[in-house]
Amino acid sequence: GPWQALTASGGHYSSLAGDSDDVFCLLLKMERCAAVSLQMNYLDRSGRREVLINTDKHTYRLDLMKKEYKRDQEPDTLFSIERDETYRTQHTDMLKNHGKLCCSLPEGLDVLRMIDAAEKSAKAESWQKNQALR
């Protein structure tokens, strides 16, 4: 379900050129999940791209750099994916399939509201509620 509230910390902390954010951490309260942690870090020299999901029944780990998927203590499952394949697939879908695999306009606007709330939270050092739910 939709995010309920979030708090964030982040910004431009490096000597990298430009003024875009290079580190951001979010803690979100979701409709059906009390705590979601999301981190973006362009300073990580090891180039990690990971998804870790803990539920009351399982732990799932997806490592996009090592091309490994793991559930609980099961052996790793290897998969094949080119580095930029997800981006190419997204653009191909937009051009050939009218974006049927992409998010809807309302979903995209919700992501933009979340980004705006994260920026406000980092600046104010406070929790932000999802205004769309009021």
Predicted regions located by residue number:
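Short, surface-exposed beta-strand-loop junctions and turns on beta-sheet-rich folds
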Residues: L43-R45, E68-Y69, D76-T77
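Glycine-centered tight beta-turn/hairpin loop motif at sheet-sheet or coil-to-beta transitions
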Residues: E31-A35, K57-T59, E74
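Rossmann-like dinucleotide-binding domain that binds NAD(P)(H)
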Residues: G1-A35, M40-S46, P106, D110-R113
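C-terminal helix-rich "cap/oligomerization" subdomain common to oxidoreductases
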Residues: E31, D93-R134
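Active-site loop of classical SDR/Rossmann-like NAD(P)-dependent oxidoreductases
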Residues: L78-T92, C103
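Short helix/strand-capping connector loops at secondary-structure junctions
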Residues: R71-P75, T89-G99
